[in-house]
Amino acid sequence: MIYSITSSVDATLYEKVKDGVFSASANTGIDEILEIKKEMSSSLGFGPFNSRFLIKFDIPDSIKSGSDTLNTFTNPDGTEFSPPTTFLKFYSANQDKLLGTSDYLEVKAISQSWSPGIGRRSNTPITTEGCSWNYIDEHGGNFWKNSDNIIQYGGSTHSIDSSTAHTPFHLYDVGHTLRTDIKFDVSYWIAKMTASAGVNGLTKITNQGFMIKRDTGAEIDNSKLGSFSFYSSDTHTIYQPRLEFCWDDSKWTASSLSELDTTYPDRIFIYLRNNRGSYKFGEKIKFRIVGREKYPTKTYSNTSANLSIKYLPSGSAFYSVKDLKTGETVIPYDTTFTKISLDTQGNYFEIFSTNLSPERYYQLEIKLFESGSSTNTIGYYPIKDVFKVVR
């Protein structure tokens, strides 16, 4: 199961935008693009001048509800599940361009509250109300400061308990394209944000959001690096940043139904049994799928073999969801989080419509592994019937 939410606020912090007293006080709270940038010698002077960006999500009460134990959490529909693996996802707004040097971005948890503001980088004069490289709220207001109350320009972040292994980062190797969507595992930070003090040895922190930046060493050295652009929460596209809570919700209930023979994958087809065609944004959708043989063996019986429901082999079937217009996969296959379940009526899976953008059409696709295998793919089966998410 994947339950995703879009960000509530975000902003890019620029070390220097223009010459003058307000050069590090520019607010960009409603820009449609979030930037990681490093400028060396330019019209701004001798650098380097960096940018980082901040982003915050309102964590749902349903996720917070398990915080007292960290053993169970509660779905929006009231059912319980184990602590989720949580991913922070950004969609690239860069052009296709290969990197000449390796580069990587990292995520840290912000330690102070901040005002997103309503400025743009292009504003003249500069908008100084809202967070900036120097201030958390406005020019002349409160500086960014670390836990020792020392000014920390560029945003203050929490330190990591005992091990740097919890620092999420994305590595861009030489030859990678800048036009790459990225996903960070932020389960550690979400656990700290939702835990009660002292639970499982975690030090509770307040949810002030995340900072995405380059490694400090890469920011201050003299190397020339590329710039990264991602769509913000203010984009007019479908590519808003997302926080994805993922867990295994699959169930396999013993059934009197027969297993579908997948020995010859080109001789089977899969379809939806209960597609309503449109679903309200915010509801949890339960799709029932049926697998059948294209050419069932002829038998003498009072019922047609074409009416017999058979189930897909246990642990071999997974789903994905594609945007019908763009052809892009919006819920990708995952051998843990998109497993197909079974009950007495047949195979099914559930998705939250909040994972999808409203007023768009989507298509399901089923992936099958060889029976008993978790690696040998035998076929992909696009579902002919599409569906729409409506407001």
Segments from the language model and where they lie:
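Short flexible loop/turn segments that cap and initiate beta-strands
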Residues: 297-327, 331
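Short beta-strand elements
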Residues: 370-391
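Secreted, disulfide-rich extracellular signaling modules
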Residues: 1-278, 290-295, 317-320, 331, ...
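Internal, hydrophobic beta-strand segments that form the core of beta-sheet-rich folds
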Residues: 208-215, 354-377
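Extended, charge-rich low-complexity regions and/or helical-solenoid scaffolds
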Residues: 310-312, 316, 339, 343-354, ...
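Extracellular Ig-like/FN3 beta-sandwich strand-entry sites
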Residues: 83, 205-207, 282-284, 314, ...
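A generic structural signal for beta-strand entry/edge sites
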Residues: 181, 284, 344-348
